[in-house]
Swiss-Prot record:
Alphabetized NCBIfam families for the sequence: tig
Protein name listed in UniProt: Trigger factor
Subcellular location: Cytoplasm
GO biological process: cell division; protein folding; protein transport
Length: 442
C-alpha cells in the first residue's frame, strides 16, 4: 500500500492513499457476480445475466459502495501499520481520476491523532464524596409537600416578588428596528423559578402591572435562531398580570380512611426509594466531575482543534433540533450559554476515560451489560420489548458496551484517588447551590 502523510496547520493530519485499480476492478467483479446469482433481470434467466448488463444497471451505486469500503479498509491498514491512534471520525476525500493511464486511484483522509496524554500523580488527587442522610421526618415532609394540593393563583396589584407568577408580552429590536416575527404574548412563568435568562428574572422584580421594561443582551454565536446570532438585541417587556399562589388541599386529600393510610405507606416507600436513587445519581455525577476536573488541572491535556470544532457542531445540531421540536422561547437560558465549556467537559471526559480503558486493557463484561439492560428495561411497561430491541440493534449494543467500559474506568479511578466523605443532611442537599452544577440536575 502506497501512502503519503502530511500535517496541515489548521486541518489536522492528512494522508493520501493509493488503491490499485486492479483491486477496485476485482472487488467490483465479485460484487457483480454476487448480484447476478441473486437477481433476475427481464430477458435473462436467474444467474445467467451478462456481467455487462449488471454493470450498466447497478454500476454507479455498486462502485460507490465498493470504493467506500476499500477506502475504509486501506485507511485502517494504514493506521495499523503506522501504529497510530486516532480520535473522532476521519473525513474521506476522493481525488478526481484525471489521468486515466494511472494504475491506481487516489484519495485523502483527514484525521486527528489521539492526544499524547499520560495521567500523572493520580494518587495525589483528593475529592469529596457527599453522603446524604434522609430521615423519616424528611420523607414525611416530602410527602406533605407533594401530596394532592390545588394551587390557586390570585391576581394582585402589588410589586413583583420572587415566586410570583407573572404574565408578559414582549417584542425585540436590533438597532432600534423591530423584528416582528419574534413578538410573543401571554408568556407566563414563576419568577426566580424558571429556565429563562437571569436578566429577565432580576429586571422584573419590584415592577407593577403595565410597567414596561427594557434590557439588552448579546445573542450567542450558536443560538438556534440564526437571524439573531452574534447580535445585540433589545427586549421590550410589558407586564400583563402578577399572581400570588394560594395552596388549598383538595377534598380528596382531606378524607381520612384506611385506604388512604395504605396509600400513604406505599407512597412513603416509593418516595424514599426515588429520593435515594436521585440523590445517588446527583452525588455520583458530582464526584465524577470532580475527578475529571482534578485530572485536567494536574495534567496538560490539549484538545485537538478538529475534534473540538466537530463536537461544537454536533452539540449545536442537538440544541437546534431540541429548540425546534419543543417550540422553545428565545428567552430560554440554555440557548444563551457558551457551548465551549460543555464541549470541553465532554471531550475531557471522553479522552481521560479512553486513556484509562487503553492503559488497563479493559473489556466489556457481557454479564454486566445484561444486568444493565434488565435494569433499564424494568422501567418500561413491556421490558421484553426493550431487551429484544437491544438484541437486534447494533448501535444500542455499542452504546451499552461503552457505558459498561466507562463504568469500569471510573471505578478504577475512584479506587486510585483519595476520597474524603462528607455527611450532609437532606436540608443541606436541597439548599446547596446546584445551579453551578446544572448538568447534575434531573
Amino acid at each position: 500500500m502506497n501512502f503519503f502523510m502530511e500535517k496541515n496547520k489548521d486541518a489536522g493530519h492528512r494522508v493520501t492513499i493509493k488503491i490499485p485499480k486492479t483491486t477496485v476492478n476485482n472487488s467490483l467483479l465479485q460484487e457483480f457476480i454476487k448480484i447476478r446469482k441473486t437477481t433476475k433481470i427481464n430477458g435473462f434467466r436467474k444467474g445467467k445475466t451478462p456481467i455487462r448488463v449488471i454493470q450498466e444497471k447497478y454500476g454507479s451505486a455498486i462502485y460507490y459502495d465498493i470504493f467506500k469500503k476499500l477506502m475504509q479498509k486501506f485507511f485502517h491498514e494504514f493506521i495499523k501499520t503506522e501504529k497510530i491512534k486516532i480520535i473522532g471520525s476521519p473525513k474521506f476525500y476522493i481525488h478526481q481520476d484525471e489521468d486515466k493511464k494511472k494504475e491506481y486511484f487516489e484519495y485523502s483522509v483527514i484525521y486527528e491523532l489521539y492526544p499524547q496524554f499520560q495521567i500523572k500523580d493520580i494518587k495525589q488527587i483528593k475529592v469529596n464524596k457527599i453522603n446524604v442522610e434522609i430521615t423519616e421526618e424528611d420523607i414525611k415532609k416530602n410527602i406533605e409537600t407533594n401530596k394532592n394540593k390545588k394551587n390557586i393563583w390570585n391576581p394582585v396589584n402589588k410589586a413583583v416578588k420572587s415566586y410570583d407568577r407573572v404574565t408578559i408580552n414582549y417584542c425585540i429590536y436590533e438597532k432600534n428596528k423591530k423584528i416582528k416575527k419574534f413578538d410573543k404574548d401571554n408568556i407566563s412563568f414563576i419568577v426566580s423559578k424558571n429556565t429563562l435568562i437571569p436578566q429577565l428574572n432580576y429586571k422584573i422584580i419590584n415592577h407593577f402591572v403595565n410597567d414596561i421594561i427594557f434590557f439588552k443582551i448579546k445573542f450567542h454565536a450558536f443560538h438556534p435562531e440564526k437571524e439573531l446570532q452574534n447580535k445585540d438585541i433589545t427586549f421590550k417587556i410589558k407586564i400583563i398580570k402578577i399572581e400570588k399562589k394560594q395552596e388549598l388541599e383538595s377534598e380528596k386529600s382531606n378524607k381520612k380512611n384506611i385506604t388512604e393510610k395504605k396509600t400513604i405507606q406505599t407512597d412513603y416507600q416509593t418516595i424514599k426509594n426515588n429520593l435515594h436513587s436521585q440523590i445517588n445519581i446527583i452525588t455520583d455525577k458530582y464526584l465524577e466531575n470532580q475527578i475529571i476536573q482534578k485530572i485536567v488541572e494536574k495534567n496538560i491535556l490539549l484538545l485537538p482543534p478538529l475534534l473540538f470544532q466537530k463536537e461544537i457542531k454536533n452539540l449545536y445540531k442537538q440544541y437546534t433540533k431540541q429548540y425546534q421540536e419543543e417550540n422553545s422561547n428565545i428567552l430560554e437560558k440554555k440557548y444563551h450559554m457558551s457551548l465551549d465549556s460543555e464541549v470541553k467537559k465532554r471531550l475531557y471526559f471522553q479522552i481521560i476515560i479512553e486513556q484509562i480503558i487503553l492503559n488497563n486493557k479493559l473489556f466489556a463484561d457481557e454479564n454486566n451489560i445484561q444486568k444493565l439492560i434488565k435494569k433499564i428495561s424494568s422501567n418500561y411497561k413491556n421490558p421484553m420489548e426493550i431487551i429484544k430491541l437491544y438484541n437486534k440493534n447494533k448501535n444500542l449494543k455499542n452504546t451499552m458496551k461503552n457505558i459498561e467500559l466507562e463504568r469500569q474506568a471510573m471505578l478504577l479511578l475512584k479506587k486510585s484517588i483519595k476520597i474524603e466523605k462528607q455527611n450532609w443532611n437532606f436540608e443541606r442537599f436541597l439548599n446547596y447551590n446546584w445551579a453551578s452544577h446544572e448538568e447534575l440536575m434531573l
